Amino acid sequence: MPLVTIEVADTVPVAKRFAYAEAVNAGLVEGLGMDAEDRFQVIHPLPADHIVADPHYLGGDRRDVVYVRILMVRMYDAESKARMFDAVARGLEAEGVRPDDVFIAVTENTLDDWYPGARGEW
């Protein structure tokens, strides 16, 4: 059960924000084999001047960064996460986000750190 936060400039149209969320979810499904219904996302539109990214870090050419933070249970190996990063980036690129503008960070924890609601069972 990942908890995904997507941070984008508030100039991105609402429909496009939801398309980004769809692309991220599809990337998790493709890259990690998660169920498509295992979807918990928060979209944060921010003023463009509140999104800071070095435009040339690691030789990049960043202009309109989309930050994707994924909080998930530690259960995937590095290869699976690499597949997920690639799938998310490809999905966002299909929605018009340049690969240099995709920034994904994963934080992992254990099942003991989650409460999935009163009826949730692991």
Predicted segments, located by residue:
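Interaction-mediating elements
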Residues: 1-122
